Amino acid sequence: MDPYKFRPSSSFDSPFWTTNSGAPVWNNNSSLTVGARGPILLEDYHLVEKLANFDRERIPERVVHARGASAKGFFEVTHDISQLTCADFLRAPGVQTPLIVRFSTVIHERGSPETLRDPRGFAVKFYTREGNFDLVGNNFPVFFIRDGMKFPDMVHALKPNPKSHIQENWRILDFFSHHPESLHMFTFLFDDIGVPQDYRHMDGSGVHTYTLINKAGKSHYVKFHWKPTCGVKSLLEDEAIRVGGANHSHATQDLYDSIAAGNYPEWKLFIQIMDPLHEDRFDFDPLDVTKTWPEDIFPLQPMGRMVLNKNIDNFFAENEQLAFCPSLIVPGIYYSDDKLLQTRIFSYSDTQRHRLGPNYLQLPANAPKCAHHNNHHEGFMNFMHRDEEVNYFPSRYDPVRHAEKHPIPSTVLSGKREKCIIGKENNFKQPGERYRSFSADRQERFINRWIDALSDPRVTHEIRSIWISYWSQADKSLGQKIASRLNVRPSI
């Protein structure tokens, strides 16, 4: 089946106006009325159709990552990693794969300024010969929480107050005061890189630990990292106010204009590699999404590059309807037992079905570019042309068969059912190390941002004391400086 064979396209536009059903429209300016000044007639089908379509133009916006911009391009393998994975699109240097990327802010609504202090989404959809691979990450290599059970609460806390619809620091600091694992993420968010200059000048990260499997079935844990060839650039507070005040869509425009001018953005893709047999050797859990892997132990190894060389043709079709799901993987790449990744496997596809409908993977931006076949059919907005008589499996009348078997991780797991926190939390070491890596003026700006947040009049003495305690455990001098400026005694 060819999913594009019967697809409506502007390439087939008629030279004159029509209704959705193709009937010619001889007047698209005036309603049908009784006389020149009389009431409008309900029988004016063209008017009814036009208004009904307009009333339904908007779809539910993403609950997070609503504000975003997309572009198309290709991924090219530059270094051989076939010893690590049997993924076809990574089979050899020089292999190119078409892709589409969506950059985004996270918390605020569609149309909000792109200069707010907020993580940035960095999602890549690879259209491989073995199906789509979605690498759905952020510009920071860590996250606020490690268990998806807390994701709805976290988003609620970061979103505007449900009563006033204003994002307020006291709500954020209250929630995360219960989650010291968030400190590492805050050393990125409240750092100078918390407001990227634009989408072209920011890092990307797969954030989670993934698994690569080679033809022999050997598995390795990996972390994915995107590095822009033009470097990382950010906006300080005054710059963000100036840029955002002049153009609330500055990052979207910068991306579009750069590609249109032939100044194609490029990122190098690196991986960190760990043998799963060694995962217990460290003072952190390699599957803990609030931790980074030290680069002196796990150096960044180059594997490819991404070039964005084509703007999207239509914002709604290729940005609003573009749907990413961490569940979409290909042979040779697998998940890990990262608790947050495990919940995203379900949650993302579930929210796309709500937002776009059960057949969202038939939409052109989401459909695979390779031949594909299954019996998932019908449902709302199904436009796949099908003429089979057999819609079940197996059948002696239909030659379709199982695909060739590919290796998956063979780890043997055992344990009792339990709800608990991981053993190696170690919430303070890496945040402290990152803070101490800042220059003195960068540390000062970091402290000032925390002073500003903790000075919210609705932040209680108890919450301030908790945060000072947390930062003191990360770095004693940091906690003392915050406590001194807030006139609060550290609890440790």
Swiss-Prot record:
The active site is at residues 65, 138. Pfam families: Catalase, Catalase-rel. It is found in: Peroxisome. Heme binds at residue 348. Keywords: Heme, Hydrogen peroxide, Iron, Metal-binding, Oxidoreductase, Peroxidase, Peroxisome. Belongs to the catalase family. There are at least five isozymes of catalase in cotton. Occurs in almost all aerobically respiring organisms and serves to protect cells from the toxic effects of hydrogen peroxide. This is Catalase isozyme 2. It comes from Gossypium hirsutum (Upland cotton). The lineage of its organism: Eukaryota, Viridiplantae, Streptophyta, Embryophyta, Tracheophyta.
